[in-house]
Amino acid sequence: MAGACGKPHMSPASLPGKRRLEPDQELQIQEPPLLSDPDSSLSDSEESVFSGLEDLGSDSSEEDTEGVAGSSGDEDNHRAEETSEELAQAAPLCSRTEEAGALAQDEYEEDSSDEEDIRNTVGNVPLAWYDEFPHVGYDLDGKRIYKPLRTRDELDQFLDKMDDPDFWRTVQDKMTGRDLRLTDEQVALVHRLQRGQFGDSGFNPYEPAVDFFSGDIMIHPVTNRPADKRSFIPSLVEKEKVSRMVHAIKMGWIKPRRPHDPTPSFYDLWAQEDPNAVLGRHKMHVPAPKLALPGHAESYNPPPEYLPTEEERSAWMQQEPVERKLNFLPQKFPSLRTVPAYSRFIQERFERCLDLYLCPRQRKMRVNVDPEDLIPKLPRPRDLQPFPVCQALVYRGHSDLVRCLSVSPGGQWLASGSDDGTLKLWEVATARCMKTVHVGGVVRSIAWNPNPTICLVAAAMDDAVLLLNPALGDRLLVGSTDQLLEAFTPPEEPALQPARWLEVSEEEHQRGLRLRICHSKPVTQVTWHGRGDYLAVVLSSQEHTQVLLHQVSRRRSQSPFRRSHGQVQCVAFHPSRPFLLVASQRSIRIYHLLRQELTKKLMPNCKWVSSMAVHPAGDNIICGSYDSKLVWFDLDLSTKPYKVLRHHKKALRAVAFHPRYPLFASGSDDGSVIVCHGMVYNDLLQNPLLVPVKVLKGHTLTRDLGVLDVAFHPTQPWVFSSGADGTIRLFS
């Protein structure tokens, strides 16, 4: 670059008395135009390149004597003199240009942070106002400042964290939403602040203090400024203040302070009360309690039942006076004139006076509570829909009472067992009997396999459990079920089991029977595990083998208990955990099958438990009893009942939960089915909401029996009930 301050191109050796330039300085000096060139232009950038060259001419004479002399002759000296004169003429111009450049460069060094180059000119407003907009503010021209597109997911951030060496010092600007890289000075500032140090690294908080005003008395004053004139003349302002205060004292506006009284003062509560007033005397009066009125036992001619016998008289004589219910013995006199004087009259009056004199009296405020306020506010039933409200279908076909029923997992088929020795399969939508299987005995319990990929029904008949393939629905599903049962390979050494697995005959196979599990005692209940491979049965015996577990795939039976805890009424599997719930007459025990230990024991406070059901979530249990109680247990709350419902008038026979809706139902011998809304919240701090919503009636009482079993539809808010009248009813 050429400039007005540049010197002519010459070798370093041609300058007499000057130091030889460094190689990098020689590269910077290129052939600039001569100062004498009138066409050469002056600019700030050109002047700043060679600023300070005027110092070269001001070197000491010692450097001049050290330069090269002799051989160059007068010609070289003449050239050096001309060059020195040109540099001397250009020096003032270069110096002024250098000072102007320095002023222009330092113009904004002392500016405050309020004048920084802020890209977002939205102002001092919360940026949360722009969370739902694609921009973050407006520029000086009124155009929107759009947010940068953030399409990077967590994987991209992780890659940046691994690949980018400056990831740890990159932050996001909240004003513009862009990523900023912290400089070394900013990082060092953050480190100092984290260590509790000052932000300025050059600040020394422990500089030595200079005590200017020391304790030594100096001869001369610190300042020797002459005093003002106003310090020698009276102040007019103070004169006006004094005159105003004197005028206020004369007018009585300013009063002198009262002398302080050192004696303490106390507030008298009864200073304003008149002791002779009627209300004052009777305000704290509490009347004495009245004597109890005499009863029939104190009559001179009491009824015969109030007269004590000889045994009661002797027992009364042996008791302590404090333990006696009556402090006298009732007596009978023929007439009132034959009644003698009461021997304890003076003693009772003396005790009465002692009670009035010594016993303190207390005024009890009676609280008037509206009975309606004590009843909890429950939501209206119409706000809790859907739930079954009316009878939709009646399934007729059984000739005797229907003890049990079960619905298929898909909700299309219904199985029922009766005392007439038949097992019927119904179509739910049309109430049509699709198939009737004669089993030759009373069917006490029936359960459809909950696994939707297996078409299998288990029925308890006398001392056997029958596994039946109903052959309804998908043919591939029916065929796969038969293949699953036929794929069993018996072990080489059969183990001793508490039950016998028998193959059915060809005739029974044609009717749909597949397996028969024989037991030593009659079977009262059968239930499936949620996965459909295990089966639990209850036997009517007092032994430890009254509860058995069967595995269908391996045809293996086992007894989970070593000793009996009473007569078992029913069992159930936990829907999500390896728990087995066993209900006896007075308690419900929860066993952990993997750990083989008792987890919890529930006390329903009922005389005789009849049925039990587990909530689909697994945290709540309901059980019915023969003393017309329905008990709700919250397993997370306590082992005692959360709530006891007494809506039925007779014994409860069955209870059930809906798999999807917050509904549960109970069937009783009074011929009714009561549907209740039971909402279980995910919040553990909120208790379940139990509201009875509908009473369904339709069954007729037969032999003092009503509803024997209830079951919900798996997907619809429908409930099925079987009764002693031989019918099955669907309420929707």
Swiss-Prot record:
<dbReference type="GO" id="GO:0070545">
    <property type="term" value="C:PeBoW complex"/>
</dbReference>
<dbReference type="GO" id="GO:1901796">
    <property type="term" value="P:regulation of signal transduction by p53 class mediator"/>
</dbReference>
<dbReference type="InterPro" id="IPR019775">
    <property type="entry name" value="WD40_repeat_CS"/>
</dbReference>
<keyword id="KW-0853">WD repeat</keyword>
<dbReference type="Pfam" id="PF08145">
    <property type="entry name" value="BOP1NT"/>
</dbReference>
<dbReference type="GO" id="GO:0005694">
    <property type="term" value="C:chromosome"/>
</dbReference>
<dbReference type="GO" id="GO:0000027">
    <property type="term" value="P:ribosomal large subunit assembly"/>
</dbReference>
<dbReference type="GO" id="GO:0051726">
    <property type="term" value="P:regulation of cell cycle"/>
</dbReference>
<dbReference type="GO" id="GO:1990904">
    <property type="term" value="C:ribonucleoprotein complex"/>
</dbReference>
<dbReference type="GO" id="GO:0030687">
    <property type="term" value="C:preribosome, large subunit precursor"/>
</dbReference>
<dbReference type="GO" id="GO:0000460">
    <property type="term" value="P:maturation of 5.8S rRNA"/>
</dbReference>
<comment type="subunit">
    <text>Component of the PeBoW complex, composed of BOP1, PES1 and WDR12. The complex is held together by BOP1, which interacts with PES1 via its N-terminal domain and with WDR12 via a high-affinity interaction between the seven-bladed beta-propeller domains of the 2 proteins. The NOP7 complex associates with the 66S pre-ribosome. The PeBoW complex associates with DDX27, BOP1 interacts directly with DDX27.</text>
</comment>
<keyword id="KW-0597">Phosphoprotein</keyword>
<dbReference type="InterPro" id="IPR036322">
    <property type="entry name" value="WD40_repeat_dom_sf"/>
</dbReference>
<feature type="repeat" description="WD 4">
    <location>
        <begin position="563"/>
        <end position="601"/>
    </location>
</feature>
<feature type="repeat" description="WD 3">
    <location>
        <begin position="518"/>
        <end position="560"/>
    </location>
</feature>
<keyword id="KW-0677">Repeat</keyword>
<feature type="modified residue" description="Phosphoserine">
    <location>
        <position position="112"/>
    </location>
</feature>
<feature type="compositionally biased region" description="Low complexity">
    <location>
        <begin position="31"/>
        <end position="43"/>
    </location>
</feature>
<protein>
    <recommendedName>
        <fullName>Ribosome biogenesis protein BOP1</fullName>
    </recommendedName>
</protein>
<dbReference type="InterPro" id="IPR012953">
    <property type="entry name" value="BOP1_N_dom"/>
</dbReference>
<keyword id="KW-0539">Nucleus</keyword>
<feature type="repeat" description="WD 7">
    <location>
        <begin position="702"/>
        <end position="732"/>
    </location>
</feature>
<dbReference type="GO" id="GO:0005654">
    <property type="term" value="C:nucleoplasm"/>
</dbReference>
<feature type="repeat" description="WD 6">
    <location>
        <begin position="647"/>
        <end position="686"/>
    </location>
</feature>
<dbReference type="GO" id="GO:0005730">
    <property type="term" value="C:nucleolus"/>
</dbReference>
<dbReference type="GO" id="GO:0042273">
    <property type="term" value="P:ribosomal large subunit biogenesis"/>
</dbReference>
<feature type="region of interest" description="Sufficient for nucleolar localization">
    <location>
        <begin position="251"/>
        <end position="413"/>
    </location>
</feature>
<dbReference type="InterPro" id="IPR028598">
    <property type="entry name" value="BOP1/Erb1"/>
</dbReference>
<feature type="repeat" description="WD 5">
    <location>
        <begin position="604"/>
        <end position="643"/>
    </location>
</feature>
<dbReference type="GO" id="GO:0000463">
    <property type="term" value="P:maturation of LSU-rRNA from tricistronic rRNA transcript (SSU-rRNA, 5.8S rRNA, LSU-rRNA)"/>
</dbReference>
<keyword id="KW-0698">rRNA processing</keyword>
<feature type="repeat" description="WD 1">
    <location>
        <begin position="397"/>
        <end position="436"/>
    </location>
</feature>
<dbReference type="Pfam" id="PF00400">
    <property type="entry name" value="WD40"/>
</dbReference>
<dbReference type="InterPro" id="IPR001680">
    <property type="entry name" value="WD40_rpt"/>
</dbReference>
<keyword id="KW-0690">Ribosome biogenesis</keyword>
<dbReference type="GO" id="GO:0006364">
    <property type="term" value="P:rRNA processing"/>
</dbReference>
<comment type="function">
    <text>Component of the PeBoW complex, which is required for maturation of 28S and 5.8S ribosomal RNAs and formation of the 60S ribosome.</text>
</comment>
<comment type="similarity">
    <text>Belongs to the WD repeat BOP1/ERB1 family.</text>
</comment>
<dbReference type="GO" id="GO:0043021">
    <property type="term" value="F:ribonucleoprotein complex binding"/>
</dbReference>
<dbReference type="GO" id="GO:0000448">
    <property type="term" value="P:cleavage in ITS2 between 5.8S rRNA and LSU-rRNA of tricistronic rRNA transcript (SSU-rRNA, 5.8S rRNA, LSU-rRNA)"/>
</dbReference>
<feature type="repeat" description="WD 2">
    <location>
        <begin position="438"/>
        <end position="478"/>
    </location>
</feature>
